């Protein structure tokens, strides 16, 4: 594999320290200055102990950070020992294999094999992942010393189906030496397949017992100890996530609280009525004679297809079946031929001695095609939903999952009884000693000093330093406050009367002037009550034309008042403003405008000012020298990909790239594209990056007066969101060359740093002393950073909790440095990242990830606003299989409209984040 980076033998970094054998990423000697660079607090960062021969996927850790005040925290992990013996790895093939068997059935087959078929061979017991991998702590004694063996046996379970013959073939594929993992955590072993397999084996060991006992997914299991019914046929079960994670010189099991969405147990009638939002006694709503609408049947079918039901027929054992689809007619109306005579489903069951109580109710069709009345089916509890939770239930899921830090920590510690590592025969067999007696591990953290922020002329305090991740706009003016020359108000909420509109106008004008914006006393035109018969775009056209007739120009801004359920209207408004006309729009919910406070309108101004070209605040240069060095002009990118929801086929993924155009890293622009569904690599990254870079250089020349030679960036910092650890290599091999190509095509000679920012992980931190926590939430304070103990043994990474946290337990962002030509120290990169978390324009609180990454997330989520709502393209265009997908993708790309040229240079995305297209 080709080595990436500058590939020099000897070079000099910008600070003048000599580098030996420097390469931009793993695959060669580490980028360690011979004389350690100074950290932000003037100290030399603590050195690391990594053997020179060790290779990595990303950048080797250059040093440990030292900046900030020390803080001791608990991490939600338990320390574990490693096995002393060789682990034997076997491939598993189960026949018959005409279809993929459920993992749960596979687990039961292997359990039956070990305990009933070949007990002597599996002593001590082996562990199995439910698919292809089985691990044993001693070599399985196959006859004749063979490497492979077939076990044939008959297996019957409690589903009511006849016993079947199965053949399990086990083939030895490797021996896993845990010593490789021990060498890895002390920095003497590369992160290779041997290490990955060892980690995989240990994860299978700790998950084996819960997988056999409880409902589970890949990494979590769920217990019925804490259940909440939220409607829609859904129950939420509290559970536990667990994952073996190598740390620095120690190995841990990361344990967290998780939430599983289950189908409600009980009768199928009860489940169906709950899904449809009907009362429990409204059984006849499911009657075809009463005329249950077909759309409701289809809605119910979408939700419960795939559910396992147990059929209770007198005189026969209960039988487990899977719902395939629903009928639109009742059992009394569904006819079929039996003994050359046409009878109904209801008559057939009556011939078996079963008189249906509800013969007119619709029926289910199960996997083998049989039709079964609803009343004969019950739903066993503990069935995980594989579909996305409906949007109207999301708030209840969040409420159930949200726990204050001390409560979450107690729940994890209380979960030791359920995890029961000491009682697991599998954990004991493999010699793991999980130290749960000592409780959660203690970790050394630091709290970084926040950056200073600079506001505009006329501010009583132009430079401020946030405290606890927050500040306010009292007596402050925007750094660059814009002028609203003309504006229009359009009201789409009938109950929002003229007096309410006048309150809105007064409150908004006052708030604008408080922060230094210039605005006329009155809007040029207002629509007190929109015409319910006319289209939204037509009414916005009329409002714009009225403004032009009255003032001779288009409005600078249109404020739109929406009803509470106005999400579809929002999409049409944004298409009109951002795509068709290039006029900024600000949508406000009528409910929030009613008797709104001055604080509410101040928050609206934060969004509006940047939408029309302003800058709210900038980082004060001396407090973030790593970001604002004038000798190294910088463009900071944020990039993201959003994929279609589970269960949707033929839908594309949407990509976004955001970058700053100004020298202060406060003014951002964005571009979005369409690509093949579920593809993580951004295939158009070169063109998207060029779009940002061209406009950045143009802005710096025209607006900042920079000479052409000084307008081009000398540093590029690329933050990438949404990439799993298994995709790091692909990002390096595919996206990094595209970013370099963009620079080369534009003649830009910039040093690149590429960083993955991850939020989908389960690492949490809790202050050891509650007095050190955030005063309101009890979380670790904003700026808490950890790059030791539970961090990666060899690669440059850190956890940064940059926000104060309001509800629940804050989740830190995990930063992994994949490529670094800028030779950042741990302190400088941590400080830079923390500073960027304070530049999210629509907030006076630091956010959980750097602002450009947050913006990229929003741009992806708003991708549906690039489609003409009149075509209903997002809901009508759906390919049914992979052969249709290319045509569907072409259609999605063709109908994806580019931003209006005026909006392409503005922060049009500084607004509410709506759900992505699904």
Residue ranges and their predicted role:
Residues 2-918:
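Long, low-complexity, intrinsically disordered terminal regions
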């Amino acid at each position: 594999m080709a080595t990436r980076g500058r590939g020099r033998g000897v070079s000099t970094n910008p600070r003048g320290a000599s580098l030996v054998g420097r390469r931009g990423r793993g695959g060669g000697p580490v980028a360690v200055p011979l004389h350690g660079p100074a950290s932000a607090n003037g100290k030399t960062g603590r050195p690391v102990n990594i053997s020179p021969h060790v290779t990595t996927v990303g950048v080797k850790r250059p040093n440990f950070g030292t900046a900030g005040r020390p803080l001791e925290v608990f991490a939600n992990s338990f320390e574990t020992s490693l096995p002393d013996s060789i682990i034997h790895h076997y491939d598993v093939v189960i026949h018959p294999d005409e279809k993929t068997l459920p993992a749960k059935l596979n687990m039961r087959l292997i359990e039956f094999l070990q305990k009933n078929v070949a007990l002597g061979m599996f002593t001590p017991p082996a562990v199995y992942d439910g698919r292809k991998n089985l691990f044993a702590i001693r070599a399985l004694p196959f006859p004749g010393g063979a490497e492979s063996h077939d076990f044939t046996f008959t297996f019957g379970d409690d589903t009511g189906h006849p016993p079947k013959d199965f053949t399990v073939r086990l083939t030895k594929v490797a021996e896993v030496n845990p010593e490789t993992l021990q060498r890895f955590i002390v920095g003497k072993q590369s992160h290779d397949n041997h290490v990955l397999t060892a980690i995989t084996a240990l994860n299978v060991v700790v998950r084996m017992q819960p997988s056999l006992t409880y409902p589970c997914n890949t990494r979590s299991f769920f217990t019925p100890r804490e259940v909440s019914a939220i409607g829609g046929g859904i129950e939420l079960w509290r559970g536990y996530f667990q994952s073996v994670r190598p740390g620095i010189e120690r190995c841990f099991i990361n344990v967290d609280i998780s939430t599983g969405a289950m189908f409600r147990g009980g009768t199928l009638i009860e489940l169906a009525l709950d899904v449809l939002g009907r009362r429990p006694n409204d059984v006849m709503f499911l009657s075809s004679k009463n005329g249950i609408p077909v759309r409701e049947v289809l809605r119910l079918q979408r939700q419960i297809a795939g559910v396992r039901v147990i059929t209770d027929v007198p005189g026969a054992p209960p039988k487990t079946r899977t719902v395939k689809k629903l009928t639109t007619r009742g059992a009394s109306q569904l006819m079929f031929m039996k003994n050359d005579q046409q009878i109904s489903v209801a008559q057939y069951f009556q011939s078996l001695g079963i008189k249906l109580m509800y013969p007119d109710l619709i029926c289910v069709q199960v996997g083998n095609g049989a039709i079964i009345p609803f009343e004969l089916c019950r739903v066993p509890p503990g069935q995980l939903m594989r579909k996305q939770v409906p949007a109207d239930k999301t708030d209840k899921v969040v409420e159930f999952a949200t726990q204050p830090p001390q409560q979450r920590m107690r729940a994890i510690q209380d979960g030791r009884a359920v995890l029961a590592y000491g009682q697991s025969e599998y954990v004991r067999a493999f010699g793991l000693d999980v130290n749960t007696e000592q409780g959660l591990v203690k970790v050394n953290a630091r709290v970084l000093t926040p950056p200073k922020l600079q506001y505009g002329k006329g501010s009583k305090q132009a430079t401020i330093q946030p405290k606890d991740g927050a500040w306010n706009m009292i007596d402050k003016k925007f750094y660059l406050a814009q002028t609203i020359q003309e504006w229009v108000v359009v009201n789409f909420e009938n109950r929002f009367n003229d007096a309410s509109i006048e309150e809105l106008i007064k409150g908004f004008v006052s708030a604008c002037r408080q922060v230094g914006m210039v605005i006329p006393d009155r809007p040029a035109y207002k629509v007190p009550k929109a015409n319910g018969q006319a289209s939204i775009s037509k009414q916005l056209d009329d409002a714009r034309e009225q403004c032009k007739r009255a003032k001779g120009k288009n409005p600078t801004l249109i404020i739109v008042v929406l009803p509470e359920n106005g999400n579809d209207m929002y999409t049409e408004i944004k298409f009109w403003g951002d795509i068709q006309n290039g006029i900024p729009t600000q949508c406000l919910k009528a409910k929030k405008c009613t008797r709104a406070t001055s604080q509410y309108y101040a928050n609206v101004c934060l969004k509006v000012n940047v939408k029309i070209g302003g800058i709210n605040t900038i980082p004060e240069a001396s407090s973030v020298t790593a970001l604002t060095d004038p000798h190294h002009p910088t463009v900071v990118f944020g990039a993201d990909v959003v994929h279609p929801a589970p269960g949707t086929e033929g839908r594309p993924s949407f990509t976004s790239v955001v970058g700053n155009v100004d020298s202060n890293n406060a003014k951002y622009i964005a571009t979005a594209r369409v690509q093949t569904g579920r593809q993580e690599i951004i295939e158009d990254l070169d063109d998207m990056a060029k779009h940002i870079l061209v406009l950045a250089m143009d802005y710096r020349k025209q607006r900042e007066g920079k000479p052409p030679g000084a307008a081009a960036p000398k540093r590029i910092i690329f933050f990438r969101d949404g990439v799993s650890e298994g995709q790091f290599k692909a990002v390096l091999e595919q996206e990094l060359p595209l970013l370099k190509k963009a620079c080369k095509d534009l003649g830009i000679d910039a040093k690149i740093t590429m960083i993955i920012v991850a939020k989908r992980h389960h690492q949490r931190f809790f202050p050891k002393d509650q007095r050190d926590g955030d005063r309101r939430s009890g979380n670790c304070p904003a700026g808490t950073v950890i790059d030791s103990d539970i961090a990666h043994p060899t690669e440059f990474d850190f956890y940064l909790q940059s926000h104060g946290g309001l509800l629940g337990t804050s989740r830190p962002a995990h930063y992994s440095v994949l490529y670094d030509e800028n030779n950042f120290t741990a302190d400088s990169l941590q400080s830079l990242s923390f500073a960027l978390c304070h530049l999210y324009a629509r907030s006076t609180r630091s956010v959980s990830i750097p602002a450009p990454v947050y913006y990229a997330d929003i741009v992806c989520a708003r991708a549906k606003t690039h489609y003409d709502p009149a075509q209903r393209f997002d809901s009508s265009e759906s390919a049914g299989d992979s052969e249709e997908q290319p045509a569907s993708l072409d259609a999605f790309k063709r109908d994806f409209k580019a931003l209006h040229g005026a909006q392409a240079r503005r922060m049009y995305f500084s607004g509410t984040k709506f759900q992505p297209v699904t």
